[in-house]
Amino acid sequence: MTVDRLTSRSRAAGUAAKIAPGDLERILATLPRDPREGERVVVGTRDNEDAAIVRVPGGKAIVQTLDFFTPIVDDPYLFGQIAAANALSDVYAMGGEPWCALNIVCFPVKELPEEILADILRGGADKVREAGAVLVGGHSIEDESIKYGLSVTGIIDPDCYATNTGLRPGDVLLLTKPLGSGVLATAVKAGWDGFEAHEQELGRWGAMLNRAGGRVIRELGLAAATDVTGFGLGGHLLEMANASNMSVHVDVSTLPLMPAVLDLVATGLLPAGSHANRHFCSGNVSVHPEVDSLLVDIVFDAQTSGGLILAVPPHLVDDACSILRAEDAPFWRIGHVEEMGEGVSRLVLQP
């Protein structure tokens, strides 16, 4: 049997397949709120948080999330690892620890060998095990378009967690993975020259757990953090700035990029989701004239299983860096937070 490349079976790859933020915002605004939320919910849907935090008996809390997407690589095992790491990331971004997970599967079982699905599931299971969580089942649907991910339940201290609303003036912004996965995934899907190397780079970073960043949040009691996924670095920073009523300043020259990303963007290669992100955010962004427009595109590139943005008070920066180094986790200092003032944009991109 001739097997198509996994990435050829979907319209968009990874988190770039998300519904555009503006469309999603309009749809969700029509839904009523459950009046019982206040009894149980510590953190809900109001500020576009990465996950929900819900009280349970005994003074404890769980953190709950769900994430799945279409393939961004052709290797099934690697796809399973990336999809699982991406789903687990939401728990880490709140400061929680993954506890158990359920598989979410859509697969054309009559068209593709069963071994492909087995490899996807094996990749996901290995990553869940690496996170210290337990895989306890799942649900599958026969579908022409391959999709895989997890529903993850974590444990968390109901009095110590990070959200989009916790930015404070002076906070230093640390990023724990380089940017460009949306661009590289588009190159892989299109089969561009060198796409095999791009796939390996996507696997290197996408399958990396954000566990070290979660440890920083817990041990230092950080109030603000998020992970960078489908709305891009710019979109997720803007969510934090809006929720916290702050202005976020990014030093674009410090942003880490995956290999070849800048060259690919220069040729015009950018996923549709990235264009949608930039358009949606444009009214709240100020770009210094010396900032390269290609870098602005990358700021809004739709990421899959991206790094954490950690907002660290100045007096805790050294401690945060020490924890990340002890975990052998990469990180970059990319900007800071200021109070909103007259004529100041929510998101400022400076050289």
Curated annotation (Swiss-Prot):
Entry binding sites for Mg(2+): 50, 90, 227
GO cellular component: cytoplasm
Cofactor note: Binds 1 Mg(2+) ion per monomer.
Residues spanning the membrane: none
GO MF: ATP binding; magnesium ion binding; selenide, water dikinase activity
CDD domains: SelD
Catalytic function, reaction form: hydrogenselenide + ATP + H2O = selenophosphate + AMP + phosphate + 2 H(+)
Enzyme class, spelled out: transferase
Alphabetized SUPFAM superfamilies for the sequence: PurM C-terminal domain-like, PurM N-terminal domain-like
PANTHER family: INACTIVE SELENIDE, WATER DIKINASE-LIKE PROTEIN-RELATED, SELENIDE, WATER DIKINASE
HAMAP family documented for this protein: SelD
Subunit structure as annotated in this protein's UniProt entry: Homodimer.
Free-text function comment from the UniProt entry: Synthesizes selenophosphate from selenide and ATP.
Protein name as it appears in the record: Selenide, water dikinase
